[in-house]
Amino acid sequence: MKPDEAHLLQALCEVRDPAEMRRVLSDLLTRSEAAALHKRWAILCLLRDGVPQREIARRIGGSLCNVTRGARLMRNPACASAALMDRL
C-alpha cells in the first residue's frame, strides 16, 4: 500500500460521525462519484436482503451487469462490504 493511500484510510477511520463523513466525502468526491458509490452500496444492501437481481436493476435504475458484479462480490467469503454490513 502506498503511504498516501494508508494516510487517507487512516484519516477516514478517524471519522466517527455520519454528518462529518458526509462532509469529508463531499470534499473528496464529485457528485457523480458520490452517486455511484451510493448506488453500489444500495445494490449490495438489496442483494443482502434477498431482492432478485432484475428487481434491483429496475429499482436502482442501474444495469443488470452492475448488479451481477455486486452479486458475485457478495458471494465471495472475503467480501469486506458484507462483513461491514454484518457489523451494522
Can you say where each PLM-predicted feature lies in the sequence?
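Short, amphipathic alpha-helical "recognition" segments used to contact nucleic acids or chromatin
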Residues: 37-51
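Long, compositionally biased
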Residues: 47-55, 87-88
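Short, solvent-exposed alpha-helical "recognition" segments
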Residues: 70-85
